[in-house]
């Protein structure tokens, strides 16, 4: 019987080898991709539970199928914990991803072809904020706002003037590569001034918001969307919040049956675990440590005139660095750092002049190393290792030194092999 084949290593050695190799990679590489984090064993256990067997179209208490009394408890736990964590009146935990959450929010708020003002991808926005290759840009008329050319920060007066000019039905705030705190109250004032809805995509900063170390968009936005991984340190998935009952009904209808069929109740269970972890007072210490580590790492780059720190600093979990004084582009930097077991990604910088496949910058985030227990000292060391590798990118002896120093760090802060 299929139930006898419970050991992946014995049943599917080829797959197991790939999984094991990834486990070793995570254990021995320094993870600096800003959208990645390391979940607890409890989150993984919930996601790998028997809940994966259950189909449950609909919502708790109103399902299409029978036998849903147990998953109703699971999903209700996730909903109530999300509401408590973020101080929201309503929560939808069924969205499979942040992109699905954004799609549902758009469906609830606007019609195809409506004008939307969102952060330009090159300035730090996300694909789902109007990129022409994405469903958002294909379905709606997105107009992008950027950052100030001098400060590389959001200029709210300029955004207001742009909103007056284009008269959007919706304004989207939030980013995937913006290192500064966002003033959601100002964004709501801009939206109110032009009669637009305000939607905030807090995917990257959700954990910081939950911990109270970053301003919350929930009191100001008509709808807030998020992923449940990144700084929130949960499973890969989506979340939608609102304080408006009428919008909550539209959101639920947009998610199911509008965009999705059956929810992934095993993932929702993992979300519930992550929300409970984030409700623990210790999570605030973790989130503050992310900010402290990121600031410490960014400061090392700021003090080296061979690199340019975008916007001059960071207020959250991420920062961007222009690397073109020491290496041709961000792609080469990313590939080189992969070779010394430091993982990050190339990233466009504001007013980028290179191809998005090359870029002038790299993006660095500290959520994952903070989950391993690394602190300010280690963050500074990692920054120096990155600089050492990039500056000496043609010197294999020095690159090998960096590899050994990376291994010493990861051995000192084990991930799942404690």
UniProtKB/Swiss-Prot annotation:
One of its GO terms (molecular function) is glycine hydroxymethyltransferase activity. It comes from Streptococcus pyogenes serotype M18 (strain MGAS8232). Its main location: cytoplasm. It is found in: Cytoplasm. One of its GO terms (biological process) is tetrahydrofolate interconversion. Belongs to the SHMT family. NCBIfam families: PRK00011.1 (NF000586). Homodimer. Pathway: One-carbon metabolism; tetrahydrofolate interconversion; Amino-acid biosynthesis; glycine biosynthesis; glycine from L-serine: step 1/1. The modification N6-(pyridoxal phosphate)lysine is found at residue 230. This is Serine hydroxymethyltransferase. Pfam families: SHMT. CDD domains: SHMT. InterPro entries: PyrdxlP-dep_Trfase, PyrdxlP-dep_Trfase_major, PyrdxlP-dep_Trfase_small, Ser_HO-MeTrfase, Ser_HO-MeTrfase-like, Ser_HO-MeTrfase_PLP_BS, SHMT-like_dom. Catalyzes the reversible interconversion of serine and glycine with tetrahydrofolate (THF) serving as the one-carbon carrier. This reaction serves as the major source of one-carbon groups required for the biosynthesis of purines, thymidylate, methionine, and other important biomolecules. Also exhibits THF-independent aldolase activity toward beta-hydroxyamino acids, producing glycine and aldehydes, via a retro-aldol mechanism. (6S)-5,6,7,8-tetrahydrofolate binds at residues 121, 125-127, 355-357. Keywords: Amino-acid biosynthesis, Cytoplasm, One-carbon metabolism, Pyridoxal phosphate, Transferase. Its EC number is 2.1.2.1. It catalyses: (6R)-5,10-methylene-5,6,7,8-tetrahydrofolate + glycine + H2O = (6S)-5,6,7,8-tetrahydrofolate + L-serine. Its cofactor is pyridoxal 5'-phosphate. GO terms for cellular component: cytosol. The keyword Transferase applies. The gene is glyA. It is an enzyme of class 2 (transferase).
């Amino acid at each position: 019987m299929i139930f006898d084949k419970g050991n992946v290593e014995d049943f599917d050695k080829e797959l197991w080898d790939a999984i094991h190799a990834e486990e070793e990679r995570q254990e021995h590489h320094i993870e600096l991709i800003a959208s990645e984090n390391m979940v607890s064993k409890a989150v993984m256990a919930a996601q790998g539970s028997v809940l994966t067997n259950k189909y449950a179209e609909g919502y708790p208490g109103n399902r299409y199928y029978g036998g849903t009394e147990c998953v109703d408890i699971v999903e209700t736990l996730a909903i109530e914990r999300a509401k408590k964590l973020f101080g929201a009146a309503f929560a939808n935990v069924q969205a499979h991803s942040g992109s699905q959450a954004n799609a549902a929010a758009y469906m609830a708020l606007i019609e195809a072809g409506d004008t939307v003002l969102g952060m330009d991808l090159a300035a730090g926005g996300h694909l789902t904020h109007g990129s022409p290759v994405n469903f958002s840009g294909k379905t709606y008329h997105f107009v992008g706002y950027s950052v100030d050319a001098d400060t590389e920060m959001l200029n709210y007066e300029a955004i207001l003037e742009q909103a007056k000019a284009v008269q959007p039905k919706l304004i989207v705030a939030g980013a995937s590569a913006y290192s500064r705190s966002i003033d959601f109250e100002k964004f709501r004032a801009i939206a109110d001034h032009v009669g637009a809805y305000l939607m905030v995509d807090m995917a990257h900063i959700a954990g910081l918001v939950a911990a109270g170390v970053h301003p919350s968009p929930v009191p100001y936005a008509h709808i807030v969307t998020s992923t449940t991984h990144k700084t929130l340190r949960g499973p890969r998935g989506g979340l939608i919040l609102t304080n408006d009952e009428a919008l909550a009904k539209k959101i639920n209808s947009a998610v199911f049956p509008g965009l999705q069929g059956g929810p992934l109740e095993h993932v929702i269970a993992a979300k519930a675990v992550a929300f409970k972890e984030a409700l623990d007072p210790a999570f605030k210490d973790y989130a503050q440590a992310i900010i402290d580590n990121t600031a410490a790492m960014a400061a090392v780059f700021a003090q080296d005139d061979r690199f340019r720190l975008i916007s001059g600093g960071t207020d959250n979990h991420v920062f961007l660095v222009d690397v073109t004084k020491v290496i041709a582009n961000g792609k080469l930097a990313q590939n080189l750092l992969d070779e010394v077991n430091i993982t990050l990604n190339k990233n466009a910088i504001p007013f980028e002049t290179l191809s998005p496949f090359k870029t002038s910058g790299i993006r660095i985030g500290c959520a994952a190393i903070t989950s391993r227990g690394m602190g300010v000292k280690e963050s500074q060391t990692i920054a120096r290792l990155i600089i050492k590798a990039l500056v000496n990118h043609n010197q294999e002896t020095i690159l090998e030194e960096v590899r050994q120093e990376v291994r010493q760090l990861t051995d000192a802060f084990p991930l799942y092999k404690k």
